Structures are given as structure tokens and as C-alpha cells.
């Protein structure tokens, strides 16, 4: 087994390209007639020849089952305060840091470093991958996109990117927004007749950004409906109405507030409103400065449009059972609180419909605890403090090593295109097996072009085989198997 040491502080990472987005999904090969699931052998879980549902009946989805609130360790931190503060400092650097080594989109040093080539390269890659005349992608009507459609998208995206930093490019997100690979709401699916393609795997869907996220605008689309932006995690296109400009006075105030008191949401779909006025929907992964904490309440800063496209700060009151000061102590009972809100929600490739995929799930889950993870699985495993590569070991050794050395809630498990959080080990089907929390699309049989769909955030064991269908390839039995330790 190969051990790779990485710096104590979360490593810098490259802004992802859409083609590198790893989100619990593997590319298929073209099926033949012998590979398809026959309706005659289908159970009630049958969907169509390339899809069925995986039965979760044997795997409890109760958070209290896997994280008992009455256990002796429920209130014991799983990492020490100094380590947590180190990660929290890295998080604030990514969001608000303005020094030469910081990577905030409001940081002129950082933006200047990527303007020369990276921003243009990302766009060019998307042009070549999705709009080339020989490239075929499908729309929501199961028909291939036309040459005319491709040219319209290319023309709308083909505006100039200034290679010089301008302070006027700084913006902030005022409501959660989807990030697209190109400026269109139209999907671009690979062949929907193949397993693991079509819905929900829209190649243009990259990620989402939460309200309060600092961004830098690189360019407008030709129709002005979209902005091409740099965020702390991705480069892509967002709707123009979801962001507003920030001036130096706003940046100074917002950064000062965030450095003093930064908080995070710990529940899904919190409607942020005041005096009958709705502002945005928040969920885990949304972080905002706050001014003070009153009994049962926080007074929280939210960015709003002042009416002329510029940001101003509005103060709203939030309950302390939905918003907490960061970094929240990383204890089993606290992480269980967040999981109770997040678990059981549908899978969303690239945050489609603001649901999570595998990497978005962990990014959002760990944010309240001051731990900033990148936005794709391959970068997330490299962002941990220490990586153990078990790719050359067999399934038995992989399971035994994780049972013996895994640290609950601070060990990430990576396989190609997918990532999970180890939460401890338990006896499952008479075997001592690692348990995970993950957001997963599904499992696949070896050599069979079909998917057994789970389709959401679940507690799931890393069994060598699954009795529900022994032909399914285990998540432990993949070409790569790496453990990343947050420590």
C-alpha cells in the first residue's frame, strides 16, 4: 500500500473543468442485446432494460441507528481544536483571503494568476467538447442537438475575456444559483439509450453556488442573461440576476465581519426572509457573517441588491437550530444533526435542482465544521492531510485496513468518480464491515450495461458482495481505492 503525505493545510487545487467533474457516475460502453435486463426477470424494482432500483430494505437509514445520540462518544470531538482551526483558516482563505497566497475570487493576486490562460482554457475546452461539429449530444426530447443549436450557444458564449484584473469584476451571489458549463439552460446528455447516460447527467451542469459566495465576473454572454464567473470552487456561467456587484467599501465590511464571526446553516431548505420579504433559500454549505448572538437567535448579514445592481448588507434574524457559529465542534451528535437534514434527499448531478452529488454532499456536510473541500471527488481526496492508496490490494485487505485504521467522520473513501465518508464499522450480514455516508447514483454489474439505482444520500455498507444482487460490483472492488484522512 502506498502512502502519500500532503501538507497539513488543505492543499490548493485547480478550478475544475466540467470534464473533470467526478460525481458518483462512470461512463458506460455501448450495450448489446445480451447485456440488457429482461422484463420477464424483472421484479417490482424494474424500470427499463438499462435501469432497476436497488433495494435498501436491509440497510437502516436511521441516523440514530448509526450515530446513537446516547453513546459515550456522542459529544466527544473527533478532531482537536487546533486541527479544526487550521482547516477553518484555510476555508476563510478560499472565501475571503486577500493575500498573495490566498485563493478568494475577490483577491486580485489570485484572479490575475488565472486570467492569462485558465479562464479561456476552460471555455475553449467546453467549446471543443460539446460544440464541435462532430460531437453529438442529446436534449431533453431525446433528439440530438442540431448544428444551428451549437452555433447559437457558441455565439452567445464567445464574448471577450479581459486578461487584466478589474475591481469592478467583483460580485457576490444573492440567491443560490446553478453553474453551467456554457450559457444555456438546455441540457447536453450523452446517449440516453445507454446505461448511466441521459437524465440526470447533463454535461453542462457543473455545480451550484450559495448565497453569500464571493465571485469574480470574467465576461457577459452576448444576450446578457449569463455571467462567466470564477468562484471558490468552479469556473462557469450563472444567471445574471442571481449576482450583484460589490465595491471596495462592501468588500472591506463583508471580509471584516467574516473574519470576526462566520456562521453556517445546518438544515436543508431554510427560507431566509425578514418582515415578509423573501431573500433566498439556504442549506448546508451556505455560510454568512453574523454580528451577534441573542438568546435563541443570530443576527446575520445577507447580501441583497440595493436596487441598482450593487450589493448592500441587510441584517436578518435566524434561529440557532438552523444556523451555528463556525467552526462548529465536530462531534458525532453535531454531524448527526446535519445528516438528519441532508440524508434521504435525491441525487443531483452537478447540483441539478440544487440536490447534491457525491462530492457536493461532503462539501456541504463538512462546511459548518470549518472544513473546506473542493468540488470534485478526485480533488477532495487530494485535499486531505494524508492519503493511503490501497489500489493494489485485494477487497479483503481494503476492508480490513479501513476497519482497523479508519477514523469515523474524518476519513474519506475514494474510488474512480465517487467519494464517501467513513462513519465507523458494524456487523452487517455476519461480517464486520465499514459503514459509509454517501450520495450515490447506483451500482453496476461487471460487464453488464445497466444500473441498479440508489439515487440519493444514504448510509451504505462497503460489503464485498451485495445479497440483493450478487452480480453487482462492490464499491470496494474498483480499480482505485484510496483513503484520505482529515487530521
Where are these regions (language model features)?
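Bacterial signal peptide processing site
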Residues: 25-27
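SH3/SH3-like (including bacterial SH3b) beta-barrel domains
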Residues: 190, 196-210, 274-283
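Second-shell loop/turn segments in exported
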Residues: 202, 275, 321-326, 344-353, ...
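...with weaker cross-activation on analogous glycine-rich loops/strands in unrelated enzymes
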Residues: 208, 374-446
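Low-complexity, Gly/Ser/Thr/Pro-rich intrinsically disordered linker/tail segments
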Residues: 50, 55-71, 75, 433-435, ...
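C-terminal motif of bacterial Sec signal peptides marking the signal peptidase cleavage site
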Residues: 21-23
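Boundary regions of SH3-family modules and the immediately adjacent low-complexity/disordered segments
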Residues: 31-180, 184-191, 196-200, 216, ...
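Active-site nucleophilic cysteine motif
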Residues: 339, 349-380
Amino acid at each position: 500500500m502506498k502512502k502519500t503525505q500532503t501538507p497539513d493545510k488543505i492543499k490548493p487545487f485547480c478550478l475544475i473543468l466540467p470534464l473533470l467533474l467526478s460525481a458518483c457516475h462512470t461512463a458506460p460502453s455501448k450495450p448489446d442485446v445480451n447485456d440488457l435486463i429482461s422484463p420477464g426477470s424483472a421484479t417490482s424494482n424494474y424500470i427499463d432494460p438499462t435501469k432497476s432500483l436497488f433495494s435498501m430494505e436491509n440497510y437502516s437509514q436511521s441516523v440514530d441507528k448509526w450515530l446513537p445520540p446516547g453513546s459515550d462518544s456522542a459529544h466527544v470531538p473527533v478532531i482537536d481544536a487546533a486541527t479544526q482551526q487550521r482547516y477553518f483558516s484555510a476555508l476563510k482563505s478560499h472565501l475571503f483571503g486577500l493575500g498573495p497566497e490566498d485563493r478568494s475570487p475577490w483577491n486580485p493576486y489570485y484572479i490575475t494568476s488565472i486570467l492569462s490562460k485558465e479562464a479561456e482554457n476552460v471555455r475553449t475546452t467546453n467549446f471543443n467538447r460539446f460544440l464541435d461539429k462532430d460531437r453529438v449530444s442529446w436534449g431533453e426530447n431525446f433528439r440530438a442537438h442540431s448544428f444551428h443549436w451549437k452555433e447559437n450557444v457558441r455565439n452567445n458564449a464567445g464574448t471577450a475575456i479581459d486578461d487584466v484584473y478589474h475591481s469592478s469584476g467583483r460580485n457576490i451571489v444573492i440567491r443560490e444559483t446553478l453553474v453551467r458549463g456554457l450559457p444555456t439552460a438546455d441540457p447536453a446528455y450523452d446517449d440516453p439509450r445507454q446505461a448511466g447516460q441521459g437524465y440526470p447527467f447533463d454535461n453542462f451542469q457543473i455545480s451550484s453556488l450559495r448565497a453569500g459566495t464571493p465571485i469574480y465576473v470574467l465576461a457577459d454572454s452576448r444576450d446578457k442573461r449569463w455571467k462567466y464567473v470564477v468562484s471558490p470552487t468552479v469556473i462557469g456561467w450563472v444567471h445574471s440576476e442571481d449576482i450583484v456587484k460589490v465595491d471596495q467599501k462592501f468588500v472591506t465590511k463583508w471580509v471584516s465581519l467574516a473574519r470576526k464571526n462566520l456562521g453556517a446553516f445546518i438544515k436543508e431548505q431554510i427560507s431566509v426572509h425578514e418582515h415578509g420579504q423573501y431573500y433566498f433559500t439556504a442549506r448546508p454549505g451556505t455560510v454568512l457573517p453574523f454580528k451577534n448572538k441573542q438568546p435563541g437567535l443570530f443576527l446575520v448579514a445577507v447580501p441583497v441588491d440595493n436596487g441598482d445592481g450593487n450589493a448592500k448588507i441587510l441584517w436578518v434574524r435566524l434561529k440557532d437550530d438552523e444556523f451555528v457559529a463556525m467552526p462548529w465542534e465536530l462531534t458525532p451528535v453535531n454531524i448527526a444533526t446535519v445528516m438528519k437534514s441532508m440524508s434521504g434527499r435525491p441525487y443531483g448531478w452537478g447540483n441539478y435542482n440544487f440536490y447534491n452529488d457525491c462530492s457536493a454532499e461532503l462539501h456541504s456536510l463538512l462546511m459548518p465544521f470549518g472544513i473546506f473541500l473542493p468540488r470534485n471527488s478526485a480533488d477532495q481526496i487530494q485535499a486531505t492531510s494524508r492519503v493511503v492508496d490501497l489500489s493494489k490490494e485485494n477487497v479483503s485487505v481494503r476492508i480490513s485496513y479501513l476497519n482497523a485504521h479508519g477514523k469515523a467522520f474524518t476519513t474519506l473513501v475514494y474510488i474512480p468518480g465517487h467519494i464517501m465518508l467513513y462513519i465507523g464499522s458494524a456487523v452487517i450480514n455476519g461480517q464486520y464491515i465499514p459503514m459509509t455516508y454517501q450520495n450515490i447514483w447506483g451500482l453496476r454489474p461487471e460487464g453488464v450495461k445497466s444500473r441498479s439505482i440508489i439515487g440519493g444520500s444514504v448510509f451504505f455498507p462497503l460489503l464485498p458482495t451485495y445479497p440483493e444482487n450478487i452480480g453487482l460490483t462492490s464499491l470496494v472492488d474498483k480499480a482505485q481505492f484510496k483513503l484520505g484522512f482529515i487530521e
